[in-house]
C-alpha cells in the first residue's frame, strides 16, 4: 500500500502502475477540505515512489467525484483571508497530479462534476465509460471552477467549447465529451479500469507521447489573437443576453479565461483564483449556494417522509378535468401512475385530455417523447363521468372550482365511493383544509395537495396538513409527489397556506402604490429588471387571473381581517368588477392579443389608467417600489415561520423559488433578509409602518435582531 487515507487509497495495480482510488465513506466522493489534504498527501507519496511508470485515477463508487463539498462554502467564504488561502492552495494540489513524472490516466464513471472534472483535466489522458457525465456546473452556484478548470479546459478542448461548458454549467454525456476532445476514449463500464491501465502502459512504453499531451496545459493558450478575440466577443454577447447583470459568474468566467489566455499555468491559475475569490464575496454567490443547501435540506426531509410511508400510491383519481385536472392527470400518467380523470361534463373531460395531448405533442416535436410513449401515456388516463370509476384508486386529487361549498360537497360524495384506505386530497390554493375536512368521515385520510400552474412545468407541490391529518397520510402523499417528479413541501393549515399567504401582502403593497396613482407599468419594470422577478406584480396578477386574485382576497380577509382587509376600491377589485380578468379574457392591467406573425402581445391599456385613476409615466424611486412590494412579503413569510406554518427558513425559500419564481440570485425571502441585514430591514420597514400592518415587523424579528440570531438557525425560529 502506497497510501491509505479516509477517502483515498493508493496501491500498485500491477508492477510499476499505481491506482489512486477515491473511496469516501459516504455515498459519493467529493472534495471537502479533508479530502483535498489527503489528495495532496497521496500525490506527494506517488511523487516519491520508486519504480513508478504510470498512474490511473479511479473511483470505487458508481460515480467518480461530484465536486467540492458545498456545505463548507458559506462558513469558508465568510472569512476573506481564509478563502483566498484555500482556493490558492487547493488549486495547486491539482498541479501536483499534473506534475507527476509518469503518465496519468483518469478513469471516469458516472458523474465527474466540478472538482471531479478538474481532477480529470489535470490527468494526461481521460477514459470515460458509457455512463459518464462530465461538467463544470459552478456558475449555478454563482461561482467559477476553482481548481484550474478555466485554465485547463480551454487548452484541452479549445476556448470556444470551454466557454460554452463553463458559462452555461451544462453537463455533457461521454460521447459528447469525446467529440470535443474532453475525453480520449469511451468504453463499456466493465472495461473501464482495463482500458485506463492499457493506456497508461502504452504511454509508459513510448507508444503515446504523454509529455506532448501534457505540455499545452502548462503554456499560454494556442490560439492566434484574431481567433481569440472573435471567440471572446461572441461569448460576451451570449453571456450578456443569457446571464444579464444579476448573475456575475459567467462574466467572471470569461474574464478569468481572457486574463489567463496569454499566461503560463501559474499566471492563468492566479487569474482564476482572483476571479473565484471575487465571486465568493458577491450576494449572488451567497444566495445561489444558499439555494443549493436549502434544496438539499428540502429533498432530505421529503425522503424521510417518503421512507416512512406505509401506503404506496399505484393508481390515482383526479376530480375535475379542465386545465389543472388535465395537467395533474398527465403528470401522474407520465410518471407511471395511471389516472382516472372524472368530471360531470364531457366537454371538461375533452378539455383535460386535450391539455394532456397538447403537452405531449410539444414533447414529440422537441424529440423528448416518441409516438409510442405518447400513446402509452394517453392510454394511462381514463376520462369518465362516473364516480364508480375511481372506487379502487389509492389516492384522489380533487381539482374542482375554488369554492368551499362545491369542494366540500364533492369531497364528501367521493369519500363514500373510494376505499377506506384510500387517501383524499384537495388541490385548493387557499381554502382551509381543516374546514373542508369537517364534512368528511375520515379526516385523518385527507390533506391538501396544492399544485401550481402549469402543472407539468412548476416543480412545487404544497402538502397541507389539516388539524386531523395523520402522519401516514402526509407520508404517502409526499411519496406520491416525489414519484411525480415534484418538490413537495409540507406546511400546516392556514388561509392561503404558505405561498399564497405570502403572495397577497406583496400584491397589496403593489396595489397601494397604484391606488396612489403610480403607473403599474413602471412598477412592473422595476420589479422585473431591477429586483429580478420573472413577472412584475401587475403582469403576475393578469396571469393568475384578476378574478382568481380577487376571490382569494375574500378568503385572506376572513383569515386575517385586519392585516389583509379587502378594499373594494383597490386596483384588483376594480378590475374584477369591470370584468377585466387578465390573460384569460384578453384584458386586465394589460391588453393581450397577437401580432401579424401570431406571436402573443402585451400592451398597457389607456382604459386601465382611466379605470384605476393612475397616471401613465408617474414613477416612484426604484428603491421605494422594491421596499413597498417586498417588505410585506418578507414580514408575512417571517410570520409563517414563527407560527410554525412552515418548518424552516430553507423550506420557505425553496417554496417561493419554485412556486412563485423568486429571483434565484436573491436566494429566497429569508436569504434576501439575511443579505439586507435584519437591523437594516427593520429600519426600512419602520419607515413605511404607517402604511399598515403588512409593513410592521413582528416582535419576534426584533428580538432575533437584538440577539444577533438568524432565521436559518431553526431552533431560533420556533
Curated annotation (Swiss-Prot):
Catalysed transformations (reactions): a (3S)-3-hydroxyacyl-CoA + NAD(+) = a 3-oxoacyl-CoA + NADH + H(+); a (3S)-3-hydroxyacyl-CoA = a (2E)-enoyl-CoA + H2O; a 4-saturated-(3S)-3-hydroxyacyl-CoA = a (3E)-enoyl-CoA + H2O; (3S)-3-hydroxybutanoyl-CoA = (3R)-3-hydroxybutanoyl-CoA
InterPro entries: 3-OHacyl-CoA_DH_CS (IPR006180), 3-OHacyl-CoA_DH_NAD-bd (IPR006176), 3HC_DH_C (IPR006108), 6-PGluconate_DH-like_C_sf (IPR008927), ClpP/crotonase-like_dom_sf (IPR029045), Enoyl-CoA_hyd/isom_CS (IPR018376), Enoyl-CoA_hydra/iso (IPR001753), FA_oxidation_alpha_subunit (IPR050136)
Segments for region (Enoyl-CoA hydratase/isomerase): 1-188
Binding, substrate: 295, 500, 658
Site (Important for catalytic activity) location in chain: 118, 138
Chain sites annotated for binding NAD(+): 324, 343, 400-402, 407, 429, 453
Region of interest (3-hydroxyacyl-CoA dehydrogenase), residue spans: 310-718
Family according to the record: In the N-terminal section; belongs to the enoyl-CoA hydratase/isomerase family.
Function per UniProt: Involved in the aerobic and anaerobic degradation of long-chain fatty acids via beta-oxidation cycle. Catalyzes the formation of 3-oxoacyl-CoA from enoyl-CoA via L-3-hydroxyacyl-CoA. It can also use D-3-hydroxyacyl-CoA and cis-3-enoyl-CoA as substrate.
Name this protein carries in UniProt: Fatty acid oxidation complex subunit alpha
Organism: Idiomarina loihiensis (strain ATCC BAA-735 / DSM 15497 / L2-TR)
Amino acid at each position: 500500500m502506497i497510501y491509505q487515507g479516509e477517502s483515498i487509497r493508493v496501491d500498485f495495480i500491477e508492477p510499476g502502475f499505481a491506482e489512486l482510488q477515491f473511496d469516501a465513506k459516504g455515498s459519493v466522493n467529493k472534495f471537502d477540505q479533508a479530502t483535498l489534504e489527503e489528495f495532496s498527501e497521496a500525490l506527494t507519496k506517488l511523487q516519491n515512489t520508486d519504480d513508478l511508470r504510470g498512474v490511473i485515477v479511479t473511483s470505487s463508487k458508481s460515480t467518480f467525484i461530484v465536486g467540492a463539498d458545498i456545505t463548507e462554502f458559506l462558513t469558508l467564504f465568510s472569512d476573506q483571508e481564509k478563502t483566498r488561502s484555500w482556493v490558492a492552495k487547493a488549486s495547486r494540489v491539482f498541479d501536483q497530479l499534473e506534475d507527476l513524472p509518469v503518465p496519468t490516466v483518469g478513469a471516469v464513471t458516472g458523474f465527474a462534476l466540478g472538482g471531479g472534472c478538474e481532477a480529470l483535466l489535470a490527468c494526461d489522458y481521460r477514459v470515460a465509460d458509457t455512463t459518464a457525465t462530465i461538467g463544470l456546473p459552478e456558475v449555478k452556484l454563482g461561482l467559477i471552477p476553482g481548481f484550474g478548470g478555466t485554465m485547463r479546459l480551454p487548452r484541452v478542448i479549445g476556448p470556444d467549447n470551454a466557454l460554452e461548458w463553463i458559462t452555461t454549467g451544462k453537463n455533457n454525456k461521454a460521447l459528447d465529451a469525446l467529440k470535443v476532445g474532453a475525453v480520449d476514449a469511451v468504453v463499456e463500464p466493465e472495461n473501464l479500469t482495463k482500458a485506463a491501465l492499457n493506456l497508461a502502459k502504452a504511454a509508459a512504453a513510448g507508444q503515446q507521447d504523454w509529455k506532448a499531451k501534457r505540455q499545452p496545459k502548462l503554456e499560454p493558450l494556442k490560439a492566434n489573437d484574431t481567433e481569440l478575440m472573435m471567440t471572446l466577443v461572441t461569448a460576451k454577447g451570449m453571456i450578456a443576453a443569457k446571464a444579464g447583470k444579476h448573475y456575475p459568474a459567467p462574466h467572471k468566467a470569461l474574464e478569468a479565461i481572457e486574463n489567463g489566455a496569454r499566461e503560463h499555468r501559474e499566471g492563468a491559475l492566479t487569474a482564476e483564483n482572483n476571479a473565484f475569490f471575487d465571486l465568493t464575496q458577491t450576494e449572488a454567490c451567497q444566495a445561489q449556494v444558499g439555494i443549493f443547501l436549502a434544496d438539499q435540506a428540502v429533498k432530505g426531509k421529503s425522503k424521510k417522509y417518503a421512507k416512512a410511508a406505509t401506503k404506496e400510491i399505484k393508481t390515482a383519481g383526479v376530480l375535475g378535468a379542465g386545465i389543472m385536472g388535465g395537467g395533474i392527470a398527465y403528470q401522474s400518467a407520465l410518471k407511471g401512475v395511471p389516472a382516472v380523470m372524472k368530471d360531470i361534463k364531457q366537454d371538461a373531460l375533452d378539455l383535460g385530455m386535450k391539455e394532456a395531448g397538447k403537452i405531449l405533442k410539444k414533447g414529440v416535436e422537441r424529440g423528448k417523447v416518441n409516438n409510442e410513449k405518447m400513446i402509452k401515456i394517453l392510454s394511462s388516463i381514463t376520462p369518465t363521468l362516473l364516480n364508480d370509476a375511481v372506487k379502487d384508486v389509492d389516492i384522489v386529487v380533487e381539482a374542482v372550482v375554488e369554492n368551499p361549498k362545491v369542494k366540500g360537497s364533492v369531497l364528501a360524495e367521493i369519500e363514500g365511493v373510494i376505499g377506506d384506505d384510500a387517501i383524499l386530497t384537495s388541490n385548493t390554493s387557499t381554502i382551509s383544509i381543516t374546514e373542508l375536512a369537517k364534512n368528511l368521515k375520515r379526516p385523518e385520510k385527507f390533506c391538501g395537495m396544492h399544485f401550481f400552474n402549469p402543472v407539468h412545468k412548476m416543480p412545487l407541490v404544497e402538502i397541507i396538513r389539516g388539524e386531523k391529518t395523520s402522519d401516514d397520510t402526509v407520508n404517502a402523499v409526499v411519496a406520491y409527489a416525489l414519484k411525480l417528479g415534484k418538490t413537495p413541501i409540507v406546511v400546516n393549515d392556514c388561509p392561503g397556506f404558505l405561498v399564497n399567504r405570502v403572495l397577497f401582502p406583496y400584491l397589496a403593497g403593489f396595489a397601494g402604490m397604484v391606488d396612489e396613482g403610480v403607473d403599474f407599468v413602471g412598477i412592473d419594470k422595476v420589479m422585473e429588471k431591477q429586483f429580478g422577478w420573472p413577472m412584475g406584480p401587475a403582469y403576475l396578477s393578469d396571469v393568475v387571473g384578476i378574478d382568481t386574485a380577487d376571490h382569494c382576497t375574500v378568503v385572506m380577509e376572513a383569515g386575517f381581517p385586519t392585516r389583509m382587509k379587502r378594499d373594494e376600491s383597490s386596483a384588483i377589485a376594480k378590475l374584477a368588477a369591470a370584468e377585466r380578468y387578465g390573460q384569460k379574457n384578453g384584458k386586465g392591467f394589460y391588453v393581450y392579443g397577437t401580432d401579424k406573425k401570431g406571436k402573443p402581445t402585451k400592451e398597457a391599456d389607456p382604459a386601465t389608467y382611466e379605470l384605476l385613476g393612475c397616471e401613465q409615466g408617474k414613477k416612484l424611486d426604484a428603491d421605494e417600489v422594491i421596499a413597498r412590494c417586498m417588505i410585506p412579503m418578507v414580514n408575512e413569510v417571517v410570520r409563517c415561520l414563527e407560527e410554525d406554518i412552515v418548518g424552516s427558513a430553507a423550506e420557505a425559500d425553496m417554496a417561493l423559488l419554485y412556486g412563485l419564481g423568486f429571483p434565484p440570485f436573491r436566494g429566497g425571502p429569508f436569504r434576501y433578509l439575511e443579505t439586507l441585514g435584519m437591523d437594516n430591514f427593520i429600519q426600512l420597514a419602520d419607515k413605511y409602518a404607517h402604511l399598515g400592518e403588512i409593513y410592521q415587523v413582528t416582535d419576534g424579528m426584533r428580538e432575533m435582531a437584538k440577539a444577533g440570531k438568524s432565521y436559518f438557525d431553526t431552533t431560533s425560529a420556533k
